[in-house]
Swiss-Prot record:
Origin species: Pongo abelii
Protein name: Protein odr-4 homolog
Taxonomic lineage: Eukaryota, Metazoa, Chordata, Craniata, Vertebrata
Coiled-coil ranges per UniProt: none
Gene (name only): ODR4
Hydrolase recorded as keyword: no
Main location: membrane
């Protein structure tokens, strides 16, 4: 027997309202949460059409299996950034006429694997062996609005065959979620070895974040001030409300403790590197995660929080690098420090749901731009007044080291009174072996948090 997908009714309404409008097909993403017993789908969003597609409608029918995978996977990566901990892109859907159904089966399968591969490549974490590895493909008839087929594939096996799956609609699914919130203070020092000058600054930073991710993975997580057994029910000890009001409005405060000292069984020696610079990420991040209220386990809640911490830090760095690349200007050779501001997190409620999605905003971006980006990526209307800016803006410093030297020092905490809006190249003077170091302030707010570093 295949997997069961419990789907929010509004998702069905959304899919029914999508018309082909002269196109051969419309494709998009399915978003929700996996569990051992069943999966929950709370959102669907179609892939935005390319401008040039409207000019090629006459030729689409001749190339039915040529879905634009690059365009669709880029949309999936953008949407993945907007998901808090606990939510994933669960699969893809496509809407066609009934007579074209068979022509799209292979294309839909390829698209599903391409989307998963593209999203997974950017993550700082890996799925566990116990987690569900199946992703769904949904094919809908454009005229009847009914399901043609619903199938799953094992993403760990590129040669896996399709398995049938149940697709069941349920009202009120989006309100049955528990939220977990925490604010994580970070101070990540990433030395840039002189031997890694051929790498881009982005790649060096990603390598450093991968090492930091192990600290987050191995941390101790307090839920409402308590350490709980990972196999316990998250709602154990919680008072349940009477009547029809379920215990779905609960919000949990999570605090993270990272290892302070190594015990005698894990001795370590200091490593001295010849460095051309260093990267220091410093500040605080607001994290949120959601899990469905049906028999939630502590380990599932902790895992969702961990992944949100890792995702939001990695995503902000990636967004900053993209912004610097788009606005590329020559580097100031006489400048030892440059200051940048990482984007801060903005939350918005999913209509009719207790779940909030997120986006990232630079200081010079308006609320209207963020609203428009939400609408473009998620194909849902939101109001500016619903935007919740969860963090305050901090500055970030970039220091260049013009001479390679052995360094174990922390970066200077000095910051300017005003952010200096200079840009930095992704590849910094590799021909002379100079890699810049910069400090990124990763944005603040909210709940207290204890962070210990060596």
């Amino acid at each position: 027997m295949g997997r069961t997908y419990i789907v929010e009714e509004t998702v069905g309404q959304y899919l029914s309202n999508i018309g082909l409008q002269g196109k051969a097909f419309v494709s998009g993403l399915l978003i929700g949460q996996c569990s051992s017993q069943k999966d929950y789908v709370i959102l669907a969003t179609r892939t935005p059409p390319k401008e040039e597609q409207s000019e090629n409608l006459k030729h689409l029918k001749a190339k039915l299996d040529n879905l634009d995978e690059e365009w669709a996977t880029e949309h999936a990566c953008q949407v993945s950034r907007m998901l808090p901990g606990g939510l994933l892109v669960l699969g893809v859907f496509i809407i066609t006429t009934l007579e074209l159904a068979n022509d799209f089966q292979n294309a839909l399968r390829r698209l599903m694997f391409a989307v998963e591969k593209s999203i997974n490549r950017k993550r700082l974490w890996n799925f566990t062996e116990e987690e569900v590895s199946e992703r769904v493909t949904l094919h809908i008839c454009a005229s009847t609005k009914k399901k043609i087929f619903c199938r799953t594939y094992d993403i760990h096996d590129p040669k896996s065959s399709a398995r049938p799956a149940d697709w069941k609609y349920q009202s009120g699914l989006s309100s049955s979620w528990l939220s977990l919130e925490c604010t994580v203070h970070i101070n990540i020092h990433i030395p840039l070895s002189a031997t890694s000058v051929s790498y881009t600054l982005e790649k060096n930073t990603k390598n450093g974040l991968t090492r930091w991710a192990k600290e987050i993975e191995n941390g101790v997580y307090l839920i409402n001030g308590q350490v709980k057994d990972e196999d316990c029910d998250l709602l154990e000890g919680q008072k349940k409300s009477r009547g029809n009001t379920q215990a779905t409005s609960h919000s949990f405060d999570v605090r993270v403790l990272t290892q302070l000292l190594l015990n005698s069984d894990h001795r370590s020696t200091a490593t001295v590197q010849i460095c051309s610079g260093s990267v220091n990420l410093k500040g605080a991040v607001k994290c949120r995660a959601y899990i469905h209220s049906s028999k939630p386990k502590v380990k599932d809640a902790v895992q969702a929080v961990k992944r949100d911490i890792l995702n939001t830090v990695a995503d902000r760095c990636e967004i900053l690098f993209e912004d610097l690349l788009l606005n590329e200007i020559p580097e100031k050779k006489d400048s030892e420090k440059e200051f940048h501001v990482l984007p801060y997190r903005v939350f918005v409620p999913l209509p009719g749901s207790t779940v909030m999605l997120c986006d990232y905003k630079f200081d010079d971006e308006s609320a209207e731009e963020i609203r428009d980006h939400f609408m473009e990526m998620l194909d849902h209307t939101i109001k500016i007044e619903d935007l919740e800016i969860a963090e305050e803006t901090n500055t970030a410093c970039m220091s260049s080291s013009m001479n390679s030297q052995a360094s174990l020092d922390n970066t200077d905490d000095e910051q300017p009174k005003q952010p200096i809006k200079t840009t930095m190249l992704l590849k910094i003077q590799q021909n002379i072996g100079v890699i810049a170091a910069f400090t990124v302030a990763v944005l603040a707010a909210g709940i207290s948090f204890h962070y210990f570093s060596d």
